[in-house]
Each structure stands twice: as structure tokens, then as C-alpha cells.
UniProtKB/Swiss-Prot annotation:
NCBIfam families assigned: rplV_bact (TIGR01044)
Family according to the record: Belongs to the universal ribosomal protein uL22 family.
Assigned keywords, A-Z: Ribonucleoprotein, Ribosomal protein, RNA-binding, rRNA-binding
GO biological process entries: translation
Annotated PROSITE patterns: RIBOSOMAL_L22
Native source species: Psychrobacter sp. (strain PRwf-1)
Subunit-level organization: Part of the 50S ribosomal subunit.
One Gene Ontology MF term: structural constituent of ribosome
Domain of life: Bacteria
One Gene Ontology cellular component: cytosolic large ribosomal subunit
UniProt name for this protein: Large ribosomal subunit protein uL22
Function: This protein binds specifically to 23S rRNA; its binding is stimulated by other ribosomal proteins, e.g. L4, L17, and L20. It is important during the early stages of 50S assembly. It makes multiple contacts with different domains of the 23S rRNA in the assembled 50S subunit and ribosome. The globular domain of the protein is located near the polypeptide exit tunnel on the outside of the subunit, while an extended beta-hairpin is found that lines the wall of the exit tunnel in the center of the 70S ribosome.
Length: 109
């Protein structure tokens, strides 16, 4: 049985989070949490939050034993992009894209 958790609208680009997601895919829960705890990437915070939510869902909603769980699927989709303006000299302006992402984690036995 697979249990899902989603984190939508995380304020980080999907490209940065995918670097972290690739490291924990297929690992056991304990190993994945260790990797995320000692990672110096900003995306590790978001992935860890979503993974802990999936673990809590498995334990509370489905009564699964968390010692036997592993990260079966993890993927990161692009969210909405917020367009912002940065004023520059002589009346000009630059466009800033603030990217977001949606993180989906599935844990199973």
C-alpha cells in the first residue's frame, strides 16, 4: 500500500528541489531522513517536511509500521510563477520570476 503526501506552492524552483529528490528516491525512511537532515541544500527542508507528513499519514491513517516503509515515489512539478518587477535606472524595469513547485512523496512497503 502506498501513502501520499503533497506540498503545494513551495517557494523554491522545481529544478533545485529535484536535486534533493533524486538522492532519497528508493531509500528507506530512516536513511532518507538522515540524508535530508545533513544536506546543505535549501530544498532538503521542503522535501523533509513532505516526507514526514507522508510518514505520519501512513502511521495514523493506515496503521502501517514505519520501520518497513521506503520512499517508493517522489517527484517535483512546477507550480505557478509569480511575475515581479525590479526598477532599474532611467525608467527601465527588469522582470523577476519567482518560481514555485509542488512536491509529491509516496511511501510504501
Amino acid at each position: 500500500m502506498e501513502v501520499t503526501a503533497k506540498l503545494r506552492g513551495a517557494a523554491i524552483s522545481a529544478q533545485k528541489v529535484r536535486l534533493v529528490a533524486d538522492e532519497v528516491r528508493g531509500k528507506s525512511i530512516e536513511r532518507a531522513l538522515d540524508i535530508l537532515a545533513f544536506s546543505n541544500k535549501k530544498g532538503a527542508v521542503f522535501v523533509k517536511k513532505c516526507l514526514e507528513s507522508a510518514i505520519a499519514n501512513a502511521e495514523h491513517n493506515h496503521g502501517l509500521d514505519i520501520d518497513t516503509l521506503k520512499v517508493s515515489t517522489i517527484y517535483v512539478d512546477e507550480g505557478i510563477t509569480l511575475k515581479r518587477i525590479l526598477p532599474r535606472a532611467k525608467g527601465r524595469a527588469d522582470r523577476i520570476s519567482k518560481r514555485t513547485c509542488h512536491i509529491t512523496v509516496k511511501v510504501g512497503e
